[in-house]
Regions:
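Short, acidic Ser/Thr/Gly-rich low-complexity loop/linker segments typical of extracellular
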Residues: 176-195
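Beta-strand-rich domain onsets/edges
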Residues: 11-30, 106-165, 171-175, 225-246
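Short acidic/polar inter-strand loop motif in beta-rich domains
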Residues: 40, 98-105, 216-222
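Short, surface-exposed beta-strand/beta-hairpin micro-motifs centered on an aromatic residue
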Residues: 80-83, 195-201
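Short, aromatic- and glycine-rich surface loops/edge beta-strands on solvent-exposed regions
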Residues: 87-101, 208-214
């Protein structure tokens, strides 16, 4: 029972585009923004208004807060947004959500999240850093990946690698299509090496989240009490199956 409860507490901020590619026939990137447990297909947690939402492309940031549209998912507040790409190159969409109070863990949670969309085959800037307090720097280009490919990254905190950082990994299990034989399969866990570098082979086509978790500063919860906090640096990566020619 204790293990099941612990496994259920793996929160992930979703920032999912309709595709990891944008081009002449698909200039508009639609983003789905939900705070939930992706592998167990819920439950969904209430989101406050994000602190920051934008896109990094060509070394410059664009504030996209005005594009956020509030919606309800399973009765909880979530968001969506659309962005029309204007130039070739990798677009790093990012969000700094409002701190979330998790009573079961007695801590505030902030998961700084990003996803990379390649526009018009530009393929430059996929490892650009947003500058979050904790962030994963990809060593593997985070798109154009086949199922079974290995994703590698470095966990960074305030610009420095985090030795032996813990990374939680979950699959976006839409509709609960993947059966979970035991709670241990819900959230995969890997540790970075002494240089903050980690690797994971993605066994199924779809979206995968990599969440590097570190202890954050003391914060105040909704009741005004001083509590611990958890900072997460997340990146979403999609892999696809190889399909034979028809």
């Amino acid at each position: 029972m204790a293990f099941a409860a612990a496994a259920a507490l793996a929160h992930f901020q979703e920032l999912i585009p309709g595709s990891e590619f944008a081009g002449e026939d698909s200039r508009v990137v639609d983003l789905d923004i939900v705070f939930t447990h992706p592998m167990s297909n819920g439950p969904v947690m209430e989101m406050g208004k994000p602190v920051e939402f934008g896109v990094l492309v060509g070394g410059g940031k664009t504030d996209l807060m005005s594009s956020l549209k509030e919606k309800k998912v399973d009765g909880k507040t979530a968001y969506s947004a659309s962005y029309k790409v204007k130039r070739p190159g990798d677009h790093v969409f990012y969000i700094a959500p409002a701190p979330y109070w998790e009573p079961a863990e007695e801590k505030m949670i902030i998961h700084y999240t990003k996803v990379v969309v390649d526009a018009f085959g530009g393929e430059d800037g996929w490892d650009a850093m947003v500058g979050f307090p904790v962030e994963i720097k990809p060593l593997t280009r985070p798109y154009g990946l086949w199922t079974g490919n290995i994703f590698r990254g470095v966990v960074m905190r305030n610009g420095e690698p985090v030795p032996f950082a813990e990374i939680e990994v979950e699959y976006l299990n839409k509709g609960g299509e993947v059966a979970i034989p035991d709670d241990a399969f819900d959230t995969q866990v890997v540790k970075a090496d002494a240089n903050g570098t980690f690797a994971y082979a993605m066994p199924r086509a779809g979206w995968w989240a990599f969440a590097a978790l570190v202890d954050g500063p003391k914060m105040r919860n909704p009741e005004g009490k001083t509590v611990d906090s958890e900072l997460g640096g997340l990146i979403w990566v999609r892999c696809r199956d190889m399909v034979g020619k028809k």
